[in-house]
């Protein structure tokens, strides 16, 4: 993957096969998929037959007819070449992926005893077979971890060298065939038979073998076919005007007029634009299951984003220590630091850092203190340390308060529990409520049954994310933050991040309901997820981006898979989708605008002998009627080659509103589509005349 990302359209490994493929695509069945180019190929065959007839019978203007014929075929070949280059980039990626395939042997298990396995060929495995994969083994096929935990190297799929953890029973249980276990062991239930693994699907998709035309492509093809039919009828009426004046127009000239007026530019590049859109996603390590998903991303109205890892860094950091009355900050900091010395969570490490940087308290040796660390559990929701007869705990406010009350009653201090600790409890609850309103998470600290205060943890909003949301807003996209936090915390983080709305205390059912509500309003919705509980919402969303680290159910439900498992990519995916639609629209505008200049080149040339007064339309001052027609047909072919890089790279994306974007593109590609042909045809005319070609 990483190597193929560097492939350029100037790479000989792509260009040379593309030239050969351009000739192979002259197959009528292949050409028939593109109505415009099929018509051009048909008239090219017709003019070739007429040229051969004239060559045999000794017709006039053979040199002119030969050149027109040659450039008509070049037009078809250049269109085929554009598509072949786009496909070639995908084939280069597919070849890179194929190299990661290895003939693997699998340890097929027939019982729960890990030592009892049978070595079989990896491609003989069936769905629901259970295999053992140990350190150094290649995972033989896609599957779900049902037992164990292991470090897995997924560089063959993602291009990232850092290993990832795969374990049973969570949202990191999916494994991909062709990846390697680096440490420990896992028991895997096979979920994909040979030939239908994730790697097989990737190869098939990036090659374009299964690429189907999207609804927008089909609609545009219908429009182009309709315009072609109109120009067929228009061209067919022209001989009658010539006959009325007592003259005639050669068929080769009529064909030249017809081919230059139909939208050959966009017709030639349409397929390449679609392939390149999916290719850009693949280079971004996102796999789209269909071109429809890429287009939908460009039309998205509502973006659902998980708070953790997307809007915030995901690792809550200690930002402040707030003691209750009668307790100093230093005392609270000392206790919080001791309780966190052996806590390897991001929150625990941040408390140690805060105590050192703000209060000058350095880390202490747990062994010298003869301390026993008390780990966090889901049942206690606390962690802490016991040493030298002292006991310190930190954790969720309600859990710590219950711990304090229980300890006071256990030692017979009922009055103390009811009076002294009630005052402290009120103070703790008040501080905790203030922190929650500010978008933070409170952790209460207690030492030997005495409440000391609260550690304020805060989800750090990612730098620049507010500006990104402002860009999306200018594009007319509504952003909704999805979080399990309480409404007060969610509102504070939403305000800081700059999202348009939020869904607090979200459940899978809430997400699904929100998506359906938005779609009922006629809006397209995009979201990302990685868990089995996200699968219904991913399937319902118009753009569902599943994380590669997620469950099999999530990956099957989404219509895109992010190989890097980075939720923030959802924003870039929308931008790539919009770039695809912008490129298609811009080049369609440019192609249609081209006709104006070609009209001024060919119409005067056709009728100059019959209607001399039409000479005023020769605003470009083209040398002769034949040079004008030849220059127009040459420009018509060369502009396809000139625009291949733009069709593959895409029009530059700018986060502005639809109205401003339309105005900008009309100026650049509409006005540019008029001016460029005037200049191009004139320069070609000068060259044709200088070389004596017409």
Swiss-Prot record:
The cross-references to PROSITE patterns, in alphabetical order and at most eight, read: ATPASE_E1_E2
| Catalysed transformations (reactions) | K(+)(out) + ATP + H2O = K(+)(in) + ADP + phosphate + H(+)
Which residues are listed for Mg(2+) binding in this entry? 530, 534
Q: Provide the protein's localization.
A: Cell inner membrane
For membrane topology, the record states:
Multi-pass membrane protein
- Where primarily located? membrane
Q: Which residues form the active site?
A: 306 (4-aspartylphosphate intermediate)
Q: Which residues bind ATP?
A: 343, 347, 376-383, 394
What are the transmembrane regions? 36-56, 62-82, 218-238, 249-269, 600-620, 628-648, 666-686
| Domain of life from the UniProt record | Bacteria
Q: Name one Pfam family in it.
A: Hydrolase
**Keyword field contains Cytoplasm:** no
Q: What is its EC number?
A: 7.2.2.6
Q: Which UniProt keywords apply?
A: ATP-binding, Cell inner membrane, Cell membrane, Ion transport, Magnesium, Membrane, Metal-binding, Nucleotide-binding, Phosphoprotein, Potassium, Potassium transport, Translocase, Transmembrane, Transmembrane helix, Transport
Q: Does the keyword Mitochondrion apply?
A: no
SUPFAM superfamilies per record: Calcium ATPase, transduction domain A, Calcium ATPase, transmembrane domain M, HAD-like, Metal cation-transporting ATPase, ATP-binding domain N
Cellular component GO terms held in the UniProt record: plasma membrane
User: Known HAMAP family for this protein?
Assistant: KdpB
Q: What job does this protein perform?
A: Part of the high-affinity ATP-driven potassium transport (or Kdp) system, which catalyzes the hydrolysis of ATP coupled with the electrogenic transport of potassium into the cytoplasm. This subunit is responsible for energy coupling to the transport system and for the release of the potassium ions to the cytoplasm.
Record's subunit section: The system is composed of three essential subunits: KdpA, KdpB and KdpC.
Family under the similarity heading:
Belongs to the cation transport ATPase (P-type) (TC 3.A.3) family. Type IA subfamily.
Name of the protein: Potassium-transporting ATPase ATP-binding subunit
User: What gene does this protein come from?
Assistant: kdpB
């Amino acid at each position: 993957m990483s190597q193929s990302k560097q492939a350029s359209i100037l790479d000989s490994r792509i260009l040379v096969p593309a030239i050969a493929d351009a000739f192979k695509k002259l197959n009528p069945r292949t050409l028939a998929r593109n109505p415009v180019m099929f018509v051009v190929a048909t008239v090219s065959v017709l003019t070739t037959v007429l040229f051969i007839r004239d060559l045999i019978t000794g017709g006039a203007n053979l040199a002119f007819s030969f050149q027109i014929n040659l450039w008509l075929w070049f037009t078809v070949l250049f269109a085929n070449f554009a598509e072949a280059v786009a496909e070639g980039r995908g084939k280069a990626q597919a070849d890179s992926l194929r190299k990661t395939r290895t003939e693997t042997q699998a340890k097929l298990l027939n019982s729960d005893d890990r030592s009892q396995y049978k070595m079989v060929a990896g491609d003989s495995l069936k769905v629901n077979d259970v295999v053992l994969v140990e350190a150094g083994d290649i995972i033989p096929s896609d599957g779900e971890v049902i037992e164990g935990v292991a470090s897995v190297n997924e560089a063959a799929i993602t291009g990232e060298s850092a290993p990832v953890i795969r374990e049973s029973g969570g949202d990191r249980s999916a494994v991909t065939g062709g990846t390697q276990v680096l440490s420990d062991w896992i028991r895997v239930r096979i979920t994909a038979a040979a030939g239908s693994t994730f790697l097989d699907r990737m190869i098939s998709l990036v090659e374009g073998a299964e690429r189907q035309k999207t609804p927008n492509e089909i609609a545009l093809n219908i429009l182009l076919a309709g315009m072609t039919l109109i120009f067929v009828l228009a061209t067919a009426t022209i001989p009658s005007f010539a006959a009325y004046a007592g003259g005639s127009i050669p068929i080769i000239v009529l064909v030249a007029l017809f081919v230059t007026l139909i939208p050959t530019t966009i017709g030639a590049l349409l397929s390449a634009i679609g392939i390149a859109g999916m290719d850009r996603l693949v280079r971004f390590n996102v796999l789209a299951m269909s071109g429809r998903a890429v287009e939908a991303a460009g039309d998205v109205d509502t973006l659902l984003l998980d708070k953790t890892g997307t809007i915030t860094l995901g690792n809550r950091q200690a930002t402040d220590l707030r003691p209750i009355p009668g307790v100093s900050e230093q005392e609270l900091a000392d206790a919080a630091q001791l309780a966190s010395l052996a806590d390897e969570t991001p929150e625990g490490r941040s408390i140690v850092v805060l105590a050192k940087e703000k209060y000058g308290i350095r880390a202490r040796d747990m062994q010298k203190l003869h301390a026993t660390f008390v780990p966090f559990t889901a049942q206690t929701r606390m962690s802490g340390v016991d040493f030298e007869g002292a006991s310190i705990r930190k954790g969720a406010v309600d859990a710590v308060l219950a711990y304090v009350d229980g300890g006071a009653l256990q030692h017979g201090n009922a009055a103390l529990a009811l009076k002294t600790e009630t005052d402290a409890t009120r103070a703790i609850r008040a501080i905790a409520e203030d922190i929650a309103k500010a978008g933070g998470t409170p952790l209460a600290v207690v030492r030997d049954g005495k409440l000391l205060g609260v550690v304020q943890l805060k989800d750090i909003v990612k730098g620049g994310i507010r500006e990104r949301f402002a860009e999306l807003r200018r594009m007319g996209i509504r952003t909704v933050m999805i979080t399990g936090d309480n409404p007060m915390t969610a509102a504070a983080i939403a305000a800081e991040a700059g999202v348009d709305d939020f869904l607090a205390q979200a459940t899978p059912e809430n997400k699904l309901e929100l998506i359906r509500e938005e779609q009922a309003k006629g809006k397209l919705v995009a979201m990302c997820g990685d868990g089995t509980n996200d699968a219904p919402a991913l399937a319902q969303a118009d753009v569902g981006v599943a994380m590669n680290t997620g469950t099999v159910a999530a990956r099957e439900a989404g219509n895109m898979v992010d190989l890097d498992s980075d939720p923030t990519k959802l924003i870039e995916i929308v931008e790539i989708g919009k770039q695809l639609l912008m490129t298609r629209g811009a080049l369609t505008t440019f192609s249609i605008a081209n006709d104006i200049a070609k009209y001024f080149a060919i119409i005067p040339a056709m009728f100059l002998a019959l209607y001399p007064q039409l000479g005023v339309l020769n605003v470009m001052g083209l040398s002769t009627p034949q040079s004008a027609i030849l220059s127009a047909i040459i420009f018509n072919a060369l502009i396809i080659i000139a625009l291949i890089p733009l069709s593959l790279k895409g029009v530059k994306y700018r986060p502005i509103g639809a109205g401003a974007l339309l105005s900008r593109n009309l100026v650049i590609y509409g006005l540019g589509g008029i001016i460029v042909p005037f200049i191009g045809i004139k320069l070609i005319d000068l060259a044709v005349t200088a070389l004596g070609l017409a």
